[in-house]
Amino acid sequence: VGNNRGDMPQSETLAHTLRDRLHLMGLKLGCGQGACGCCTVIMDGRAVTSCMVLTMDCDGSSITTIEGLADPETGDLTGLQQAFVDNCGFQCGSCTSGIIMTARALLDEKPCPTEEEVRDALAGNYCRCGTHYTAVESIMAYVEKRRSEE
């Protein structure tokens, strides 16, 4: 994460390192047991729940948080993030960064997934507000926009 290195307690999770030490507040802490997906980041190209990964096991890994998606120069949102804004893909925001990171990992692997594949990928991300369907709609709107631009 931004070439940050340092000594961490052996039992510290990546989620706590990212929030407490690196002050990356886009990542949300939810259940702390890997069940809700709120703390999802992309590690070496895969979506992982950062509350289940020890920081000491991340040496040499590439980690991307929600903060790492936007354009670093302008702060402009990615097309996927903008699709969530345009389609009201979130409500309270607790689950949003985890869902977007899971979707980003899926889209990096499969640029034009079906709705069923999106739903399957998001199976580990829970939305307490009950607006999970708007997240799926936002992702599919992004996929459709990309298809139409090809």
List where the protein language model places each region:
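Signature of N-terminal electron-transfer/Fe-S-associated modules in redox systems
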Residues: 1-150
